[in-house]
Amino acid sequence: TNNSDWMPPAIKFLAEHPNDSEYVLWFIRKLERLASYLLVTAQDVNHRVDRYKWLLVEMESRSDSTLADPLRNIELTDWEKEHFRQTLDGEIYTMTAQRRNYIIQRLDSFMSDGGASYNQKLFTIEHVLPQHPPVHGSWLELWPDEQERKYWLNRIANLVPLTRQRNSAAQNYGFATKKEKYFQSKGGTSSYVLTTQVINEPVWTPDVVKKRQAMLSEVFAEKWELNPSRQSGTDEGLFLLAGRGSSAMGYPIDKDCFLVLK
């Protein structure tokens, strides 16, 4: 990301737990998820600082935390998880290049188990269903409903990563030609799992895109653990805010309000 707000808790944690490799790995994964949430949902610097402060306050009061009884404020609340999921399910392509590139690359790395590499200078994101499909051609036959086209156009299911310069002429090719001449490398493959999946689709219809969107949303939910966790009558999913002899437990109900439960 273009900020370093995550560094103070990372440095503090590594200094306090230098010999607990399993707990360090757990913490880094949770911190990456928190940092990703703050980036993807475009939180401003004040909100980011406040959010990390909640974590640092707990770290100060619980320097003896362990993997058996880990830090809690590094977890996303149910409200944050839902906010994260809704953002990821939205119009990714309309975001800033930094945010949309990160989302696509992170998703592709999830699908490839982290084995992919990304050339930032050549990395581009392209639409499968074109932004401006030609009046005469197969695209409007497959996608006759203008509102449906607009709804799915910029969502993640309709986007593929490429490592090549944009080709404005190729963007409006029919699906079969686009796959062969634009999405594939000279060897007939792609270095990205997301693009390979699209290449393997025989047609690109609204039903295909809907199913793909649901599948990709579940990948995010699984890898970033975005399913709800808070249960009525339990402490699951709550924040513990403690410091200077006082503490409170609760959770954010939106980005500005914190509900204190006890």
What are the residue ranges of the model-derived segments?
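Flexible coil/loop and intrinsically disordered segments
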Residues: 1-242, 247-255, 260
